[in-house]
């Protein structure tokens, strides 16, 4: 559950960066200053935000490929950032099984948007997973979610 809370905080920071033009450092400071997360979860939040921002161009290219009929800019900002974060975690931060990352992204979409957003996120991430050749599991130790 700590990683779920960390992902929600990371999403809030990514949303502030994307929509509000907030700097990544300021966005992280704002979401982490509430002190609701233990240090390990704060570290995970920071890794997700910094990693997603570092790989954003490559991740956005993946989203564009699979968001058939949608321009990236036309996607709901919350969905766009859920997809960015999940694709970062699936492709570059391979500590969690892909199926868990996808399920967490679906839950975030349903909680921060609606059921339809959850289905959209699920479809896009699953298509990307298959096409990118990502196994649903991970080869090395799973740190737990």
From Swiss-Prot:
Keywords: RNA-binding, Transcription, Transcription antitermination, Transcription regulation. Pfam families: NusB. This is Transcription antitermination protein NusB. It comes from the Bacteria. GO terms for biological process: DNA-templated transcription termination; transcription antitermination. Belongs to the NusB family. CDD domains: Terminator_NusB. SUPFAM superfamilies: NusB-like. Involved in transcription antitermination. Required for transcription of ribosomal RNA (rRNA) genes. Binds specifically to the boxA antiterminator sequence of the ribosomal RNA (rrn) operons. One of its GO terms (molecular function) is RNA binding. One of its GO terms (cellular component) is cytosol.
């Amino acid at each position: 559950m700590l990683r779920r809370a960390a992902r929600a905080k990371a999403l809030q920071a990514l949303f502030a960066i994307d929509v509000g033009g907030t700097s990544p450092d300021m966005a992280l400071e704002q979401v982490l200053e509430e002190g609701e997360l233990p240090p390990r979860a704060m570290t995970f939040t920071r890794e997700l935000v910094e990693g997603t921002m570092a790989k954003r161009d490559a991740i956005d290219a993946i989203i564009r490929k699979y968001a058939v009929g949608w321009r990236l800019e036309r996607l709901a900002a919350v969905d766009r950032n859920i997809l960015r974060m999940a694709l970062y975690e699936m492709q570059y931060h391979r500590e969690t099984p892909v199926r868990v990352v996808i399920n967490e992204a679906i839950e975030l979409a349903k909680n921060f948007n609606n059921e339809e957003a959850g289905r959209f996120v699920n479809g896009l991430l699953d298509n990307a997973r298959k096409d990118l050749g990502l196994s649903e599991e991970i080869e090395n130790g799973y740190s737990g979610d």
